[in-house]
């Protein structure tokens, strides 16, 4: 008697993502491109659930983060490097994928959710996972954008160790 315990999760090195189809009704539709959205995509794909993911940009805030020292498994990793790892992991699965678009509207047609994107196309799904993340509250002062990640940061607890022994200014964003 022979047993075959091979489990093909589609974890090869090639990209298997597909384009979104207006003719499909997806089991699940993920909105967002950060760590939560990427994790949801991996879990859905591993369970064989037909899904799609749309994002303004892959990585979310992580992509705008210079250095990360509090992500398990890495003593230090640059944000863009971590985003690349997220993207590579998700793209190993057959998931419908679209980047650089935003959701404009979600409405119901019976039990089906209709998701209208900024490119004008509408997609249908039985469920929607909203993992849209958040964004930093900016001060809109001269030089802020240019110095983001090189002196201007938005998380004192996260980035404080990078500035040990330096003179700094902490400015509240009014969102605490």
Question: Which residues are covered by each model-predicted region?
Answer:
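N-terminal Rossmann-like dinucleotide/flavin-binding domain of flavoprotein oxidoreductases
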Residues: 2-9, 63-122
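Core beta-strand elements of the Rossmann-like FAD/NAD(P) dinucleotide-binding domain
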Residues: 23-26, 117-127
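Short, flexible, glycine/charge-rich loop motifs used to bind or transfer phosphoryl groups or to couple energy/partner
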Residues: 17-19, 61, 105, 118-119, ...
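Rossmann-like dinucleotide/flavin-binding elements
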Residues: 19-54, 58, 148, 154-176
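Glycine-rich beta-alpha-beta "Rossmann" dinucleotide-binding loop(s) and their flanking helix/strand
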Residues: 2-12, 119-121, 128, 132-155
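Short glycine-/acidic-enriched loop or helix-start segments at secondary-structure transitions
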Residues: 40, 63, 108, 139-141, ...
């Amino acid at each position: 008697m022979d047993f075959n315990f091979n489990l093909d999760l589609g974890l090869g090195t090639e990209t298997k993502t597909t384009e979104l189809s207006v003719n499909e009704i997806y089991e699940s539709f993920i909105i967002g491109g950060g760590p939560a959205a990427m994790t949801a995509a991996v879990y859905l794909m591993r369970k064989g659930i037909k899904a799609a993911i749309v994002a303004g940009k892959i990585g979310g805030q992580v992509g705008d983060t210079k250095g990360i020292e509090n992500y398990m498994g890495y003593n230090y990793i640059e944000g863009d490097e971590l985003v690349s790892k997220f993207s590579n992991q998700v793209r190993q699965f057959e998931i419908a994928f679209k980047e650089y678009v935003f959701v404009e509207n979600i409405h119901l047609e019976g039990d089906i959710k209709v998701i209208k994107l900024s490119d004008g196309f509408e997609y249908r799904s039985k469920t929607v996972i909203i993992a849209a993340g958040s964004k930093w509250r900016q001060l809109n002062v001269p030089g802020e954008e240019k110095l983001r990640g090189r002196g201007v940061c938005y998380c004192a607890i996260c980035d404080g160790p990078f500035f040990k022994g330096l003179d700094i200014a902490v400015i509240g964003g009014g969102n605490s």
